[in-house]
A protein has these predicted regions:
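Residues that define the transmembrane beta-barrel architecture of outer-membrane proteins
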Residues: 27-29, 44-48, 74-78, 110-114, ...
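Repeated loop/turn-to-beta-strand initiation elements of outer-membrane beta-barrel proteins
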Residues: 56-63, 87-94, 126-130, 162-170, ...
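Transmembrane beta-barrel strands of outer-membrane/channel proteins
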Residues: 35-39, 63-69, 80-82, 96-100, ...
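Residues on the lipid-exposed face of transmembrane beta-strands in outer-membrane beta-barrel proteins
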Residues: 37, 48-56, 80-86, 116-120, ...
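Outer-membrane beta-barrel transmembrane domain signature
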Residues: 131-204, 210-212
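Outer-membrane beta-barrel "beta-signal"
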Residues: 224-242
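Outer-membrane beta-barrel domain signature
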Residues: 22-26, 36-43, 68-73, 103-109, ...
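Outer-membrane beta-barrel initiation region
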Residues: 20-71, 86, 204, 236-242
Length: 242
């Protein structure tokens, strides 16, 4: 487990360094910290979040860490995503994502996830954008005490909207299992809704609802549960020129 965690970190760091483009001197670094409480069915606890990203005209790198410490369960999620726009068609971009997840509430003691695909800014506008993505993805997990790889076709829709008083985010992803190596149907839908309300310079109050649903799985009864979290967050810039 420790070795796999190290591989994940090295892969993310390598992608961040190798993914830099010629416009490095225009790159902007930001980081975000959040802490608060989380409520799920018949359980509650504390939540923590850290995010750091680097963006330039054509490239974007984003590393996120989520931690939920519940009374009876725990949730850990680490994700690194890198993307680069096509210079001739800047509304299109290619991306890759690598992630590690542990979710005892959903019966996921361990999952390594990877996906690669194509994204499109369907509707960019002044106050936000709507993005769609398609990708090929795979998991290596322990749902069935089995480490065989499970492959998926993945689609996603993402909407970000900002106003002077509040920012909102809506994400919906569907993973359709295409691998037949694992008998269990692990096709799933993941959704997240987020509201960010500014408090003072750099600080905000954040409300998030998330759900992961396995409608065709025999273990769905134990998994179709959402979480509601409330946190206070801070964001700032990092004066790096990497």
């Amino acid at each position: 487990m420790r070795r796999s965690f190290s591989i994940l970190f090295i892969a993310a760091l390598t992608t961040a360094v190798m993914g830099q483009d010629a416009s490095s001197n225009s790159a902007k670094w930001k980081h975000y910290v959040r802490g608060g409480g989380v409520l799920v069915t018949n359980d509650n606890g504390l939540s923590g979040y850290y995010r750091i990203n680097r963006s330039s005209r054509y490239t974007f790198g984003d590393l996120r860490l989520y931690l939920y410490g519940l009374q009876n369960n725990s949730y850990v999620f680490i994700r690194y995503k890198s993307s680069s726009k096509y210079r001739r068609w800047p509304r299109f971009y290619r991306f890759s994502t690598i992630a590690y997840q542990k979710n005892t509430q959903a019966g996921v003691a361990l999952r390594y996830h990877f996906n690669q695909g194509l994204g499109l800014f369907v509707l960019p506008y002044t106050q936000g954008h709507i993005i769609s993505e398609i990708a090929h993805a795979y998991d290596m997990s322990d749902y069935l005490n089995d480490n065989r790889r499970t492959s998926y076709a993945r689609g996603g829709l993402y909407w970000d909207h900002d106003t002077k008083w509040v920012s909102t985010k809506l994400e919906v992803e569907y993973f359709h299992q295409i691998s037949e190596e694992v008998a269990e149907n692990l096709s799933r839908t993941q959704a997240m809704a987020e509201i960010i309300m500014p408090i003072t310079k750099g600080f905000s109050a954040i409300i998030i609802y998330e759900i992961e649903s396995y409608p065709d799985s025999d273990i769905a009864v134990a998994i179709n549960q959402g979480s509601l979290s409330f946190s206070i967050g801070w964001k700032g810039t990092i004066p790096w020129i990497l």
